[in-house]
């Protein structure tokens, strides 16, 4: 068994894809011959355990994964609020706390990368050299170590953040998740806000992903296809 689990958040509306997600989940949008979720699931070792959040067209997501991957170890977590006041990526992630009392990888369901060997000697975040800071949060880096996560629109940065990270210090992650959600419930809350707090106590390395396909918005989806 590998020593980590993989969290895939597949509960959001995918509103940046417009009409493409009006009748389906963005993780089921196809790139080539397969849905995005297939590329993600198949990029990990056979014996890894997945935790998948369900919300927008969650029944479709669960049915697809159960049919396509009957031998995979997949736990499902239903998100009660994925589009109303108080909803956020971080809120959805927080509902998985009980399932993720171990090191874990967070993998956004609109992020497709080539298969990698994951190192958990430290916490890490994944970056890509090319991308618009107006569409993505960005990373400032020194000697392959994370210095800062920037909000969208930052002019000076080294990488864009691709929605993929490894959390070795999971207890600290959940501690700060609880603290942040107790203070505010704005819809922009994400893993990045927790990582920024963790950096006062833990180091994060930055993994440079040369190949990255983002299906989270219409323009990048067209390029990925």
Regions from the PLM with identified roles:
Residues 1-8, 16, 30, 34-103, ...:
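Conserved N-terminal catalytic core of the sugar/cofactor nucleotidyltransferase
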Residues 10, 54, 108, 128:
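Short beta-strand/turn micro-motifs composed of small residues
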Residues 81-87, 133-134, 155, 212-215:
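A short acidic, often aromatic-flanked loop/helix-cap motif at beta-alpha or helix-coil junctions
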Residues 113-186:
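Conserved core of the sugar-phosphate nucleotidyltransferase
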Residues 2-6, 160-225:
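Conserved alpha/beta core of the MobA/IspD/sugar-nucleotide pyrophosphorylase nucleotidyltransferase superfamily
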Residues 103-112:
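Short beta-strand-to-loop acidic/aromatic patch adjacent to the donor-nucleotide binding site
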Residues 12, 110, 217:
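Active-site glycine-centered loops adjacent to acidic/histidine catalytic or metal-binding residues
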């Amino acid at each position: 068994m590998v020593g980590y689990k993989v969290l895939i958040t597949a509960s959001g509306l995918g509103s940046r894809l417009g009409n493409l997600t009006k009748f389906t989940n963005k993780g089921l949008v196809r790139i080539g011959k397969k849905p995005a979720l297939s590329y993600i699931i198949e990029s990990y070792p056979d014996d890894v355990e997945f935790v998948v959040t369900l919300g927008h067209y969650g029944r479709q997501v669960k049915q697809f994964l159960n049919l396509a991957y009957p031998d995979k170890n997949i736990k499902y977590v239903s998100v009660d609020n994925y589009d109303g006041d108080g909803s956020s990526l971080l809120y959805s992630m927080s509902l998985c706390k009980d399932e993720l009392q171990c090191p874990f990888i967070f993998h956004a369901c609109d992020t497709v990368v080539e298969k990698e060997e994951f190192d958990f000697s430290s916490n890490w975040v994944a970056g890509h050299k090319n991308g618009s800071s107006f569409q993505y949060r960005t990373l400032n880096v020194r000697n392959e170590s994370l210095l800062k996560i920037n909000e969208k629109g930052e002019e000076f940065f080294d990488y864009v953040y691709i929605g993929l990270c490894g959390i070795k210090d999971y207890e600290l992650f959940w501690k700060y998740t609880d603290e942040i959600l107790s203070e505010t419930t704005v819809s922009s809350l994400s893993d990045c806000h927790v990582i920024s707090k963790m950096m006062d106590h833990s180091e994060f390395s930055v993994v440079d992903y040369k190949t990255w396909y983002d299906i989270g918005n219409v323009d990048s989806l067209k390029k990925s296809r």
